[in-house]
């Protein structure tokens, strides 16, 4: 059974989103996603300053099984990326919720209302 923290938001494409006090968003992949992928061996993250649209493929995660796109949960500007996970991609498997990938400044703060809560994501992955 996958871990699904209640204090995060989620997408149907298996990204988790933490709403920070300053209005920015921290993005990573869910425990469910890392378990399905298997051993993560490579990450390609967006550069700071990149402007992304909601749902745009903006990063790549590769495992021994597959390569998958990571999507921007909302429109905005990438303000930081976690280079420590590119140096140690296995950290995503060790703790998917500590191994954040990038931070976004949303173009519109209200855009997060379309994201799933923990119960909604649990229902989504139960199918």
From Swiss-Prot:
Keywords: Lipoyl. Residues 24-105 form the Lipoyl-binding domain. Binds 1 lipoyl cofactor covalently. It comes from the Bacteria. Pfam families: GCV_H. Its cofactor is (R)-lipoate. The glycine cleavage system catalyzes the degradation of glycine. The H protein shuttles the methylamine group of glycine from the P protein to the T protein. The glycine cleavage system is composed of four proteins: P, T, L and H. HAMAP family: GcvH. This is Glycine cleavage system H protein.
């Amino acid at each position: 059974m996958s871990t699904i923290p209640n204090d995060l938001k989620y997408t149907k494409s298996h990204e988790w989103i933490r709403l920070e006090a300053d209005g920015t968003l921290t993005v990573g992949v869910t425990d469910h996603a890392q378990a399905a992928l298997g051993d993560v061996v490579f990450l390609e993250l967006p550069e700071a300053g990149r402007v992304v649209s909601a749902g745009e493929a903006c990063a790549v995660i590769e495992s021994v099984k597959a390569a998958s796109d990571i999507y921007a949960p909302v429109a905005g500007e990438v303000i930081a990326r976690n280079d420590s996970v590119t140096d140690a991609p296995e950290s995503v498997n060790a703790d998917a919720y500590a191994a954040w990938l990038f931070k976004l400044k949303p173009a519109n703060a209200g855009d997060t209302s379309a994201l799933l809560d923990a119960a909604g994501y649990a229902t989504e992955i139960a199918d």
